[in-house]
Amino acid sequence: MKFWYTKSWIAYLLLPFSFLFWLVSQCRRWLFQAGIIKSYRAPVPIVIVGNLSVGGNGKTPVVIWLVKALQQNGLRVGVISRGYGSQSAVYPLLVTEKTDPLEGGDEPVLIAQRTQVPVCISANRQQAIELLLQTQPCDVIVSDDGLQHYKLQRDFEIVVVDAQRGFGNGFVMPAGPLRELPSRLDSVDLVIANGKANRYSQTVMTLAADYAVNLVTKEKRLLTEFESGSAFAGIGNPQRFFTMLQGFGIQLKQTYEFQDHQKFSAELFAKFSKNEPHFMTEKDAVKCFPFARENWWYVPVEAKITGQSAVNFIENIVERVKNGQ
């Protein structure tokens, strides 16, 4: 929605509906907090990684970073997710690194591959947690998204903010991209700015990439060794991926943007060049292995998060678990 990032006449026309959306969502949150509507308390601490706005803000790299950081502190970690893009006939569903992305969803499969922790998907977060704990003991559970899922009680909250796009025109849906107003940041435990520091946070996440991996041969090659190619991305903010590639000196002859959680097929790429390198995100790659070509490369990224607030956040979780609170 391009008008979400400008204060156009369309946005102003939709403001009455935005007010209704905000009013209903705030009332719903208050009812959960007051205990009038029943919410679920898990037997282990829950950490929410979410955002205030619609679209790709970089939650998945943060989830992977968080899981690894907690593992390094000796904690057993599990992950739950709604599983956007999943076509499973049964929920809750345990997702492993070998799960078909069409069944498990691209992001849950990627998280399982990168962290090797148990992942469970379901729109019903309580059922996902219960199945997860039946399968493997967990000291803490990370929820990929779910900031507005107040039916699930939480112990810690992280919000990821896209430093480039911010909160768009500042309006709540449908006039703007916001699910909640920026004032919601005052009540979360950690705000991470994706890209650079901004007015909302000095805790910064940068996505570090050094090499590309061939989908067929598994060969690794430094990105600086490529001169040109084409690229596609089916993520929330494809331009960020293209800009990153260009930053390594790669001349992109063609770029293709797809919807987030796009379903890919061999037919979709029939007209793509079979000669020049073709780059994609790791999230997209998990769906493309069955029909990959030898000129296809995916680019793994690693979240680098700086700031004492992030260190303190991890320490607080570890302390909570060890104290049995």
Swiss-Prot record:
UniProt KW keywords: ATP-binding, Kinase, Lipid A biosynthesis, Lipid biosynthesis, Lipid metabolism, Nucleotide-binding, Transferase
Binding site for ATP: 53-60
This protein's GO CC annotations: plasma membrane
Pathway stated in the Swiss-Prot or TrEMBL entry: Glycolipid biosynthesis; lipid IV(A) biosynthesis; lipid IV(A) from (3R)-3-hydroxytetradecanoyl-[acyl-carrier-protein] and UDP-N-acetyl-alpha-D-glucosamine: step 6/6
GO biological process, one term: lipid A biosynthetic process
InterPro entries named among the record's database cross-references: LpxK, P-loop_NTPase
Catalytic activity: a lipid A disaccharide + ATP = a lipid IVA + ADP + H(+)
GO molecular function, one term: ATP binding
E.C. numbers: 2.7.1.130
Similarity-based family: Belongs to the LpxK family.
Known role: Transfers the gamma-phosphate of ATP to the 4'-position of a tetraacyldisaccharide 1-phosphate intermediate (termed DS-1-P) to form tetraacyldisaccharide 1,4'-bis-phosphate (lipid IVA).
NCBIfam families: lpxK
Name of the protein in its database record: Tetraacyldisaccharide 4'-kinase
